Amino acid sequence: MGLLLLVPLLLLPGSYGLPFYNGFYYSNSANDQNLGNGHGKDLLNGVKLVVETPEETLFTYQGASVILPCRYRYEPALVSPRRVRVKWWKLSENGAPEKDVLVAIGLRHRSFGDYQGRVHLRQDKEHDVSLEIQDLRLEDYGRYRCEVIDGLEDESGLVELELRGVVFPYQSPNGRYQFNFHEGQQVCAEQAAVVASFEQLFRAWEEGLDWCNAGWLQDATVQYPIMLPRQPCGGPGLAPGVRSYGPRHRRLHRYDVFCFATALKGRVYYLEHPEKLTLTEAREACQEDDATIAKVGQLFAAWKFHGLDRCDAGWLADGSVRYPVVHPHPNCGPPEPGVRSFGFPDPQSRLYGVYCYRQH
């Protein structure tokens, strides 16, 4: 029986007449001894390929490295080693297309798109095809599939990756309910964040998030979390929970947006300065301190993960003025921890300091 030649789609321009299976074109060829395993369909004769991945969700941080575990084995075990093909890809979520991450045959591999230069297979031990992702980005969280292909036999497993982070509501300087879905995506990105998923909002509600303005989520639904039922928020008779308006038109309907930011690689700090500053002066002061003016998502992450606690209102990059409170302070607003907001004052006013961000 001829050996099976397996080549990624993008590497074989003349392959349109070949059978397509599991993201690859297959060709019966005896000419390439390096890519075949020499067994063909023998694997079907009483031997089962098993792929093992963890059932629990993996949690990590933006900028970190993480290993997505994946191992395979044969039942019953085989004496002679076999060369397999491995494919990792990120599953579709909320209408986004699937993303190829990496394909490998033996020691040869190829990564794709934004994953190039950031991913590789561990392969430290026999039958270990775990994927390492370096310099994690906000958009990397989600579900990944590990597929092992031996001839025409294939098995796969799922690994779910979640980033630890903080959800915060974001409102336009022009008031509530100003963003369509795409504008919500843009403003979250401008604040070092992404649009939050329902799971992230629900987890934030479990931790105490209470917000009465409805906002976009990643799946284009509009929802809001309520801990203390009250009249403007669905009425006092409803139980606490996450209220939903359901799916809304991505271009026509307008709401606020819930953003999600993860822990920082750098540091947010209140700049000690002899004078209060205008917004322009605040930006320049951070630059003079070898830093940049902090974004809203960075301030929330510093409050959540680094315990930033300061009762001084300061400018942020979007022109808002905020300050983070972890412990109650006299003359510092409500006793509950949170990031307080002064809204969007006149950029020329000299009433505030500034929060800066410096990368490590």
UniProtKB/Swiss-Prot annotation:
A matching Pfam family: V-set
Name the UniProt record assigns to this protein: Hyaluronan and proteoglycan link protein 3
Tissue specificity remark: Widely expressed with highest levels in spleen and placenta.
GO molecular function, one term: hyaluronic acid binding
Gene3D superfamilies named in the record: Immunoglobulins, Mannose-Binding Protein A, subunit A
Keywords: Disulfide bond, Extracellular matrix, Hyaluronic acid, Immunoglobulin domain, Repeat, Secreted, Signal
GO BP annotation list: cell adhesion; central nervous system development; skeletal system development
Ranges where the Link domain occurs: 166-261, 266-358
UniProt-listed PANTHER family: AGGRECAN/VERSICAN PROTEOGLYCAN, HYALURONAN AND PROTEOGLYCAN LINK PROTEIN 3
Disulfide bond positions: 70-146, 188-259, 212-233, 286-356, 311-332
